[in-house]
Amino acid sequence: MISMRAELAEEINGKIQILNQESDVKECKWYKLESAKNRFAIQKIIDLCLEYADIDRLRIDVLVWDSEDSRHKVIGRDDNKNLMNMYIQLLKNVIVKRWKGSGVWQIFPDQNSIIDWVHVRNILRKIDLYDDDSDSYLDRTWNQFKSLHSIVSVEEADSKLTGLCQAIDIFTGMSVFSFEKREAFTEWGKRKSPQQELFPTEKIELSNKDNEQSTVLNYCLEQMATKNINIRFENNSGLVTKDPNQVVNVWFYTPQTLSDKAPIRDNF
């Protein structure tokens, strides 16, 4: 989730559109990153976002989870509903904890037919007339700040026309890559290092996509370091943020209680 004051959105969207034109690409998406051309285009968007974040004009918050942890490793898991619940977790966390629960919010998610955004909006507004365990993600803190914020709209946006949707896709994809392909990134780092291993291990085969995505992840880490954004890569969990209040926050979700389980499909 990239969040900022409304008047900035049009400005940043316009700048990303210009950057893409200069790079001769129609759209930047993490999964499309397989060439130097796309890499350079994505790095320009990363630079732009970090430039605004560095002067506290936008936030970048990403939620990552392990589909094999105790919460998600359940029989009959409803992946669509689980994704929706995680969106709710992220929205609640950013609005209440990072923006202190204030403001009138317009939310523009990338088009995703899996998510019922009207339902998400209704849950966030607490106006659903039927039971839904997604509601459990809105805790006492959310209700405490309910009078201070208003969610006026949740409207899907076409990422081809909306640069900020491309930007959050890049940061989200990069964060997920850092966890799911952490062994590949570690192997890539070893190959780039001039130091020889004392105890060589079996090498992992790296695809062209692994190499390009690892290059961008490393580039982003270097750029954040120059701006004193304290995010690091850890071998067991990927990108890690120690201070969630800083302008770029990668939140690795862990089960909150023993009863914290992903939703199960109906009639399973």
PLM regions with names:
Residues 2-268:
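Phosphate-ester processing/binding pockets and catalytic centers
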